[in-house]
Amino acid sequence: METAKAVRIDRALAEANLIVIGASNGLDMAEGLNLFRADDHFWETYGDLAQADGIGCILQGLSSPDANVRRRWAERFHQKEHLEYEPSPLMNTLRRLTEHADAFVITCNIDGHFARAGFDVNRVLETEGSTRTSIDERRLAHPDALAAAQLEELARLVQAHRNGRVAILELGVGLRNGVIKRMLAQVASACEHATYIVFNYSQAMAPDASCETILIDGDMAPAFEEIARCRP
Protein backbone atom coordinates (compact mmCIF):
# COMPACT_ATOMS: atom_id res chain seq x y z
CA MET A 1 0.00 0.00 0.00
CA GLU A 2 1.22 3.48 -0.86
CA THR A 3 2.45 5.48 2.13
CA ALA A 4 0.21 8.39 1.10
CA LYS A 5 -2.87 6.19 1.44
CA ALA A 6 -1.72 4.88 4.80
CA VAL A 7 -1.32 8.45 6.05
CA ARG A 8 -4.80 9.39 4.78
CA ILE A 9 -6.38 6.39 6.47
CA ASP A 10 -4.56 7.00 9.73
CA ARG A 11 -5.68 10.63 9.73
CA ALA A 12 -9.29 9.67 8.98
CA LEU A 13 -9.32 7.17 11.84
CA ALA A 14 -7.50 9.43 14.29
CA GLU A 15 -9.88 12.34 13.65
CA ALA A 16 -13.06 10.24 13.72
CA ASN A 17 -15.57 10.53 16.54
CA LEU A 18 -17.44 7.51 15.20
CA ILE A 19 -15.93 4.49 13.42
CA VAL A 20 -18.27 1.94 11.85
CA ILE A 21 -16.64 -1.34 10.84
CA GLY A 22 -18.20 -3.75 8.37
CA ALA A 23 -16.44 -7.12 8.25
CA SER A 24 -16.95 -10.31 6.29
CA ASN A 25 -15.03 -13.45 5.33
CA GLY A 26 -12.10 -11.47 3.96
CA LEU A 27 -11.16 -10.38 7.48
CA ASP A 28 -11.24 -13.98 8.72
CA MET A 29 -9.05 -15.02 5.80
CA ALA A 30 -6.58 -12.25 6.60
CA GLU A 31 -6.39 -13.72 10.12
CA GLY A 32 -5.81 -17.22 8.73
CA LEU A 33 -9.32 -18.66 9.04
CA ASN A 34 -10.84 -19.88 5.77
CA LEU A 35 -14.30 -21.45 5.97
CA PHE A 36 -14.29 -22.40 2.30
CA ARG A 37 -11.01 -24.27 1.79
CA ALA A 38 -9.33 -27.41 3.15
CA ASP A 39 -6.08 -25.67 4.07
CA ASP A 40 -3.48 -26.64 6.68
CA HIS A 41 -5.51 -25.12 9.52
CA PHE A 42 -8.54 -27.14 8.44
CA TRP A 43 -6.69 -30.46 8.53
CA GLU A 44 -4.86 -29.68 11.76
CA THR A 45 -8.00 -28.57 13.61
CA TYR A 46 -10.83 -30.49 11.96
CA GLY A 47 -9.10 -33.38 10.20
CA ASP A 48 -10.62 -36.10 12.38
CA LEU A 49 -14.13 -34.75 11.90
CA ALA A 50 -13.55 -34.24 8.19
CA GLN A 51 -12.54 -37.86 7.70
CA ALA A 52 -15.35 -39.21 9.88
CA ASP A 53 -18.08 -37.08 8.29
CA GLY A 54 -16.79 -36.80 4.72
CA ILE A 55 -16.53 -33.02 4.97
CA GLY A 56 -14.37 -30.87 2.67
CA CYS A 57 -14.39 -27.47 4.40
CA ILE A 58 -15.53 -25.82 7.62
CA LEU A 59 -18.63 -24.26 6.07
CA GLN A 60 -19.76 -27.63 4.75
CA GLY A 61 -19.57 -29.09 8.24
CA LEU A 62 -21.40 -26.18 9.86
CA SER A 63 -24.20 -26.35 7.29
CA SER A 64 -24.53 -30.14 7.00
CA PRO A 65 -28.11 -31.42 6.57
CA ASP A 66 -27.33 -33.94 9.33
CA ALA A 67 -28.12 -32.31 12.69
CA ASN A 68 -25.57 -34.43 14.54
CA VAL A 69 -22.81 -33.47 12.11
CA ARG A 70 -23.77 -29.80 12.39
CA ARG A 71 -23.65 -30.01 16.19
CA ARG A 72 -20.21 -31.66 16.22
CA TRP A 73 -18.78 -29.07 13.86
CA ALA A 74 -20.38 -26.13 15.68
CA GLU A 75 -18.98 -27.33 19.00
CA ARG A 76 -15.48 -27.81 17.57
CA PHE A 77 -15.64 -24.48 15.75
CA HIS A 78 -16.75 -22.63 18.88
CA GLN A 79 -14.01 -24.25 20.95
CA LYS A 80 -11.18 -23.66 18.48
CA GLU A 81 -12.15 -20.40 16.78
CA HIS A 82 -13.76 -18.58 19.71
CA LEU A 83 -12.80 -19.92 23.14
CA GLU A 84 -9.19 -20.67 22.16
CA TYR A 85 -8.86 -17.68 19.84
CA GLU A 86 -6.01 -15.30 20.53
CA PRO A 87 -6.45 -11.97 18.73
CA SER A 88 -4.17 -11.74 15.72
CA PRO A 89 -1.78 -8.82 15.20
CA LEU A 90 -4.27 -7.55 12.61
CA MET A 91 -7.17 -7.59 15.07
CA ASN A 92 -5.07 -6.02 17.82
CA THR A 93 -4.01 -3.24 15.46
CA LEU A 94 -7.61 -2.68 14.40
CA ARG A 95 -8.61 -2.37 18.04
CA ARG A 96 -5.82 0.10 18.83
CA LEU A 97 -6.61 2.28 15.82
CA THR A 98 -10.30 2.55 16.73
CA GLU A 99 -10.47 2.45 20.54
CA HIS A 100 -10.38 6.25 20.96
CA ALA A 101 -13.71 6.66 19.16
CA ASP A 102 -17.23 5.34 19.44
CA ALA A 103 -16.91 2.12 17.42
CA PHE A 104 -19.67 -0.09 16.04
CA VAL A 105 -19.16 -3.38 14.18
CA ILE A 106 -21.43 -5.02 11.61
CA THR A 107 -20.22 -8.50 10.69
CA CYS A 108 -21.47 -11.71 9.14
CA ASN A 109 -18.58 -13.67 10.65
CA ILE A 110 -19.83 -16.23 13.16
CA ASP A 111 -16.65 -16.73 15.20
CA GLY A 112 -17.05 -13.89 17.69
CA HIS A 113 -13.51 -12.61 17.14
CA PHE A 114 -14.48 -8.98 17.75
CA ALA A 115 -15.83 -9.81 21.19
CA ARG A 116 -12.70 -11.78 22.04
CA ALA A 117 -10.52 -8.89 20.86
CA GLY A 118 -12.13 -6.49 23.31
CA PHE A 119 -14.77 -4.74 21.22
CA ASP A 120 -17.99 -3.87 23.08
CA VAL A 121 -20.34 -6.83 22.46
CA ASN A 122 -23.33 -4.50 22.65
CA ARG A 123 -21.91 -2.73 19.60
CA VAL A 124 -21.13 -5.84 17.55
CA LEU A 125 -24.06 -6.72 15.31
CA GLU A 126 -23.65 -10.29 13.99
CA THR A 127 -25.92 -10.40 10.96
CA GLU A 128 -25.71 -14.19 10.57
CA GLY A 129 -25.51 -15.06 14.25
CA SER A 130 -22.60 -16.68 16.03
CA THR A 131 -21.65 -20.02 17.48
CA ARG A 132 -21.79 -18.15 20.80
CA THR A 133 -25.58 -18.14 20.49
CA SER A 134 -25.72 -21.81 21.40
CA ILE A 135 -24.44 -21.05 24.90
CA ASP A 136 -25.76 -17.49 25.37
CA GLU A 137 -29.04 -17.82 27.28
CA ARG A 138 -30.01 -14.20 26.58
CA ARG A 139 -29.78 -14.74 22.84
CA LEU A 140 -31.60 -18.05 22.98
CA ALA A 141 -34.44 -16.49 24.94
CA HIS A 142 -34.63 -13.25 22.96
CA PRO A 143 -32.79 -13.71 19.64
CA ASP A 144 -34.26 -10.60 18.02
CA ALA A 145 -34.31 -8.29 21.04
CA LEU A 146 -30.53 -7.95 21.19
CA ALA A 147 -30.22 -7.29 17.47
CA ALA A 148 -32.96 -4.66 17.72
CA ALA A 149 -31.16 -3.00 20.62
CA GLN A 150 -27.91 -2.99 18.65
CA LEU A 151 -29.60 -1.40 15.64
CA GLU A 152 -31.05 1.26 17.93
CA GLU A 153 -27.57 1.90 19.33
CA LEU A 154 -26.16 2.28 15.81
CA ALA A 155 -28.92 4.74 14.92
CA ARG A 156 -28.22 6.69 18.11
CA LEU A 157 -24.50 6.87 17.35
CA VAL A 158 -25.08 8.00 13.77
CA GLN A 159 -27.48 10.70 14.94
CA ALA A 160 -25.07 11.88 17.63
CA HIS A 161 -22.11 12.09 15.24
CA ARG A 162 -23.80 12.94 11.94
CA ASN A 163 -22.19 16.39 11.87
CA GLY A 164 -18.81 15.19 13.16
CA ARG A 165 -16.01 13.14 11.67
CA VAL A 166 -17.01 9.58 10.79
CA ALA A 167 -14.81 6.81 9.38
CA ILE A 168 -16.26 3.68 7.79
CA LEU A 169 -14.06 0.60 7.41
CA GLU A 170 -15.25 -2.07 4.98
CA LEU A 171 -13.07 -5.11 5.63
CA GLY A 172 -13.18 -8.00 3.18
CA VAL A 173 -16.86 -7.62 2.29
CA GLY A 174 -17.63 -9.39 -0.98
CA LEU A 175 -19.78 -7.91 -3.72
CA ARG A 176 -22.62 -10.31 -2.91
CA ASN A 177 -22.83 -9.23 0.72
CA GLY A 178 -25.47 -6.61 0.12
CA VAL A 179 -26.66 -6.41 3.72
CA ILE A 180 -23.42 -5.05 5.15
CA LYS A 181 -22.68 -2.87 2.13
CA ARG A 182 -26.14 -1.26 2.26
CA MET A 183 -25.87 -0.57 5.98
CA LEU A 184 -22.46 1.05 5.61
CA ALA A 185 -23.64 3.14 2.64
CA GLN A 186 -26.62 4.34 4.69
CA VAL A 187 -24.29 5.45 7.48
CA ALA A 188 -22.09 7.27 4.97
CA SER A 189 -25.07 9.02 3.41
CA ALA A 190 -26.40 10.12 6.81
CA CYS A 191 -23.12 11.68 7.96
CA GLU A 192 -21.84 15.03 6.72
CA HIS A 193 -18.11 14.32 7.03
CA ALA A 194 -17.66 10.61 6.30
CA THR A 195 -14.61 8.83 4.94
CA TYR A 196 -15.33 5.39 3.49
CA ILE A 197 -12.32 3.04 3.44
CA VAL A 198 -12.49 -0.28 1.57
CA PHE A 199 -10.04 -3.18 1.97
CA ASN A 200 -10.51 -6.08 -0.43
CA TYR A 201 -8.68 -8.36 -2.84
CA SER A 202 -9.71 -7.48 -6.43
CA GLN A 203 -13.13 -6.26 -5.21
CA ALA A 204 -12.24 -2.90 -3.64
CA MET A 205 -15.07 -0.86 -5.11
CA ALA A 206 -16.43 2.55 -4.14
CA PRO A 207 -19.70 2.49 -2.17
CA ASP A 208 -23.03 3.83 -3.35
CA ALA A 209 -22.59 6.99 -1.29
CA SER A 210 -21.33 10.52 -1.83
CA CYS A 211 -18.30 10.83 0.45
CA GLU A 212 -14.52 10.66 0.45
CA THR A 213 -13.45 7.13 -0.50
CA ILE A 214 -10.14 5.30 -0.10
CA LEU A 215 -9.75 1.91 -1.82
CA ILE A 216 -7.12 -0.67 -0.83
CA ASP A 217 -6.80 -3.72 -3.10
CA GLY A 218 -4.57 -6.23 -1.32
CA ASP A 219 -3.70 -8.02 1.90
CA MET A 220 -5.19 -6.35 4.97
CA ALA A 221 -2.54 -7.49 7.46
CA PRO A 222 0.46 -5.60 6.02
CA ALA A 223 -1.81 -2.68 5.13
CA PHE A 224 -2.82 -2.22 8.76
CA GLU A 225 0.81 -2.56 9.84
CA GLU A 226 1.64 0.32 7.50
CA ILE A 227 -1.22 2.41 8.89
CA ALA A 228 -0.12 1.72 12.47
CA ARG A 229 3.40 2.93 11.64
CA CYS A 230 1.91 6.31 10.72
CA ARG A 231 0.52 6.76 14.24
CA PRO A 232 2.83 8.81 16.52
Model-derived segments and their meaning:
Residues 1-232:
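Conserved catalytic alpha/beta core of Sir2/sirtuin-type deacylases, generalized to analogous enzyme cores
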